[in-house]
Amino acid sequence: MKVKVFILTWQDANALNNNLKTLFDGFQCLDRVKDVHIEVNIINNHTNFSIDPRYVPHVKVIHNVAQPDFATAMLARMWNLAIIHGFKSLAEPDCDIVLTSQDDTVWEKDWIQRLVSIRNNYDFYADDAGDMVCMHTPNSVRKIGLWDERFHYGFGEGDYFLRAIKYMPKESSINDYAHGRVWNSYIRLAKRPEPDDSRYTEQNRAHRFRGLSWANFLYKWGSEDLEGKWPDDVQKRVLTIEPVPSTILYPYFELDVEDLKGKGYIL
C-alpha cells in the first residue's frame, strides 16, 4: 500500500516541526505492518518557511510561490492540490491513499497501524476538528469529487462531509467531534494540541471573510442546522437536496469523477 502524506503550512514552524516529529516517530511501527510505503510532502504557502534539518532529506516540499504572504487561507484549493499531486489520475492512480493534514496535527504513536485498519474499513476518513486530518482514496474522490474551492475559509469541510454521507455513506467515517459531525465513528489517527494564542493572530485575518463562505454553504445546503452538530436525520435530508451548479476546474483530473452531471457540474 502506497501512502502519500501532505501537510499544509500555516506560518507556524513550531507546529510544523512538532507535526513532523510525531509523524516520523510513528515510522518506528512500520515493521508491524506489511507492504506499507509512505511518502511525506509539505505544501508550503509562505516565504518564512523552515523545518528541522533532520527532516529535510525525508520530505518533499511543494512551494506555492504564487500565493503572496498577505493572502488568507484557501484550504479547499490546497486539499485539491494534494489530491491531484498525490493520485495524479483517478483512472490510473499513483498511490492508494492521500492523507492530508494541517500543520498543527499531533499524530498518535501507532498512527500507521491505525491507518491500515481505517483503510480496511473505509474509503474516506476525517479525524478530530474539521479537516485536520483526512484520508482520501481514488474511490472516494471518484464518488465524492474534489473539494469546492468556492469555500475559501471555513465551512468547506462541512460541505465535503455532507457530500461524503450523500454519495458514499457506508464507506465514509467522519470523526469531527469538535463540531458534532460524526458518522460511522472509528479509531483516531491524531489530535490537535492545546491552542496557541500567537497562532490565531494570523488566523483572525481570515475570519474577516468567513461570512462569504457561510453564504456559499447556505446557497448549497439551504439550512443552518446542517452546519455544526448534525441533526439525527442528516442523511435523509441531504439526499433530498438538489446540487447547485458547479464548474470543473481541473478537467485533466475531474472528468473521472462519477456522475458529474448528477452532482451539478456544468458539462
Locate predicted features:
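Cell-envelope/extracellular polymer assembly enzymes that use nucleotide-activated donors
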Residues: K2-K4, E39, D159
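Short, well-formed alpha-helical segments that are part of the catalytic scaffolds
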Residues: D12-Q28
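Aromatic-glycine-rich donor-binding/catalytic loop that engages nucleotide-sugar donors
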Residues: P138-G154, R163-P169, S173
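Acidic donor-binding segment of Leloir-type glycosyltransferases
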Residues: L23-Q67
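Conserved donor-nucleotide/metal-binding helix-loop-beta segment in metal-dependent transferases, i.e.
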Residues: K109-D128
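C-terminal catalytic/acceptor-binding lobe
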Residues: N19, G158-L267
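Short beta-strand-to-loop acidic/aromatic patch adjacent to the donor-nucleotide binding site
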Residues: E92-V106
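Active-site-proximal specificity loops/subdomain of glycosyltransferases
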Residues: N48-C95
